[in-house]
């Protein structure tokens, strides 16, 4: 894959872009394909720009971790100065498009999505505190709320409640991955939760958060969703998440934690698709 595409973290940002799209479709009722295309472009550029900036800012951390040592900057595929200019150009273009094409309120949320990931998470919190992902997770709220604001012209309580499905899922997902690579994080000096507390406590916290996230998603669909096809999708995600989380709590093994990570990964996507079916 082209290293400049890798800088965008496509395997990470696609879910945030999907949340923007779903927010719009869920709120709008009738889809304006031109506005949806503009939203997708602005979200992709802004979120992709923040991901590229994360690559630039964390290039020393990436070089110290076996999992990330082959990324474009530590591998020498792209000069850091190029990555910085690239990230800022994408970010600025995405944010400006958000305000110009989408309007003030959606534009604010596009900018906030960038800010929480690039500044709050990457610059302020990542190296300082295990609370890093709890601060940066608001980027997930912002992406959904931006799409919702575009579709409805405002942000209401249902929108905020639904956006917290993304916020709750992010730390449980990231911490489950960090548990597998906890030695990498310790070596790099990054205070991710599984790297700084007892492993048994980490398993308990991550598993409990996964179960809580699944329960919250199910409640959201029962309140705001409609239709059996969507309910079937949500129940499939909830069942896989709860079952593997309970197994991880009981076994407290690396294998069980990885199984939980893999099984719980699709639940947010399934929930977002269920909202579209509603």
UniProtKB/Swiss-Prot annotation:
Query: Has keyword Transmembrane helix?
Result: yes
GO molecular function terms here? protoheme IX farnesyltransferase activity
Q: What is its main location?
A: membrane
Q: Which GO terms describe its biological process?
A: heme O biosynthetic process
Signal peptide region: none
Q: Which PROSITE patterns does the record cross-reference, listed alphabetically?
A: UBIA
UniProt KW keywords = Cell membrane, Heme biosynthesis, Membrane, Transferase, Transmembrane, Transmembrane helix
Q: Which reaction does it catalyse?
A: heme b + (2E,6E)-farnesyl diphosphate + H2O = Fe(II)-heme o + diphosphate
Locations listed in the record: Cell membrane
Instruction: Please provide, in alphabetical order, the Gene Ontology terms of the cellular component aspect for this entry.
Output: plasma membrane
Look up the EC number in the record and give it: 2.5.1.141
Q: Which regions span the lipid bilayer?
A: 12-32, 36-56, 72-92, 105-124, 130-150, 157-177, 204-224, 228-248, 257-277
Topological relation to the membrane, as annotated: Multi-pass membrane protein
Q: In which pathway does it act?
A: Porphyrin-containing compound metabolism; heme O biosynthesis; heme O from protoheme: step 1/1
Tell me which Pfam families the record gives. Answer: UbiA
Record-stated family: Belongs to the UbiA prenyltransferase family. Protoheme IX farnesyltransferase subfamily.
More info: Carbon 2 of the heme B porphyrin ring is defined according to the Fischer nomenclature.
Q: Give the protein's function.
A: Converts heme B (protoheme IX) to heme O by substitution of the vinyl group on carbon 2 of heme B porphyrin ring with a hydroxyethyl farnesyl side group.
Q: What is this protein called?
A: Protoheme IX farnesyltransferase
Task: Show the taxonomic lineage.
Answer: Archaea, Thermoproteota, Thermoprotei, Thermoproteales, Thermoproteaceae
């Amino acid at each position: 894959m082209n290293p400049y595409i890798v800088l965008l973290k496509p395997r990470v940002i696609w879910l945030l872009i999907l949340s923007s799209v779903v927010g719009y479709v869920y709120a709008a009722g009738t889809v304006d394909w031109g506005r949806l295309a503009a939203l997708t472009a602005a979200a992709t550029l802004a979120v992709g720009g923040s991901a590229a900036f994360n690559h630039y800012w964390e290039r020393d951390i990436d070089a110290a971790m076996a999992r990330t040592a082959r990324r474009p900057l530590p591998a020498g595929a792209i000069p850091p100065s190029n990555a910085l200019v690239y990230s800022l150009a994408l970010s600025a273009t995405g944010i400006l498009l958000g305000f110009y094409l989408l309007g003030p309120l959606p534009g604010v949320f596009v900018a906030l999505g960038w800010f929480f990931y690039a500044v709050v998470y990457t610059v302020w919190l990542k190296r300082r505190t295990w609370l890093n992902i709890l601060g940066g997770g608001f980027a997930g709220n912002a992406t959904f709320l931006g799409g919702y604001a575009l579709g409805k012209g405002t942000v209401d309580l249902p929108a905020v409640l639904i956006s917290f499905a993304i916020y709750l899922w992010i730390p449980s997902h990231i911490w489950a991955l960090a548990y597998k690579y906890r030695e990498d994080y310790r070596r790099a000096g990054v205070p991710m939760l599984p790297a700084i507390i007892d492993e048994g406590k980490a398993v308990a916290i991550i598993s409990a958060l996964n179960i809580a996230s699944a329960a919250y998603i199910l409640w959201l669909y029962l309140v705001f969703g409609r239709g059996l096809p969507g309910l079937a999708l949500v129940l499939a995600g909830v069942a896989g998440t709860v079952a593997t989380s309970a197994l991880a709590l009981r076994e407290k093994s690396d294998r069980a934690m990885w199984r939980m990570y893999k099984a719980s990964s699709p639940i947010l996507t399934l929930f977002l698709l269920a909202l579209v079916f509603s």
